[in-house]
Amino acid sequence: MENCTVFWFRRDLRIDDNAGLYHALTSGNKVLPLFIFDTEIIQKLPKKDARIEMIHAALRNITDAMERNRCNVGMYLGQPRAVFESLLKKFNINKVVTNHDYEPYATARDKAVGEFLQNNGVAFETYKDHVIFEKSEVVKDNGTPYKVYTPYSRKWLKRFSEKSLSHYPSEAHLDQLATVVQPQLSLNDLGFEPSHVPQPQYTFNPTIIKEYEESRNFPALDKTSRAGAHLRFGTLSVRKLVAYSAQEENPTFLK
């Protein structure tokens, strides 16, 4: 196989408006998409974990969208460094692209994986995708971080009013996917079972946004977007949600 770029899905489980995927698909190489079920994380989870079920369903949805290009998302189980060590023996990989992950474990993992790849002549690139602003982008005037939420939120809204949201049309470049059949894993293969917990369905409802300031304190009301889990796993673009919400001019919802 000719030189290829790997796109490593993590908390960005969608093909549309995906910054890292867009940069991978426009890199000039064919792109090999994959997801690693990290044993360091999943071995601590209950057998009927709804989060794993949601991730697995999202990967199946991505594969369904990619199949017209004769491609699928590879599902791998193991420690990321070991998985990449194996992949380097099978494919001519010259670059691995992914999106930033901010959790302490993820930061350490990415540092180790990045060093391993670079020591083997493979570039490792990460992009901002999961947030509108990173921690260094919204700080006090003296450059130090905020410790109180209210002044932070004011600065965030001020910065947002001065910023135009980027859009990354990754969905328009799927013809750059590598035509390679990669392994698929079932929940059972991963050591899990169906949770029977209904997956939340998010909604873009202008009424919910407009009335959020009044309704947010009444959980019995059906007045939320249900976007939380989708933002957590990236099945919904935060830029897409924020752009839509900003049209309704309700800063409380944006907070």
Question: Language-model segments: what does each one mean?
Answer:
Residues 1-160:
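Trp/Phe/Arg-rich N-terminal binding region typifying the photolyase-homology
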Residues 148-255:
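Glycine/tryptophan-enriched, flexible segments
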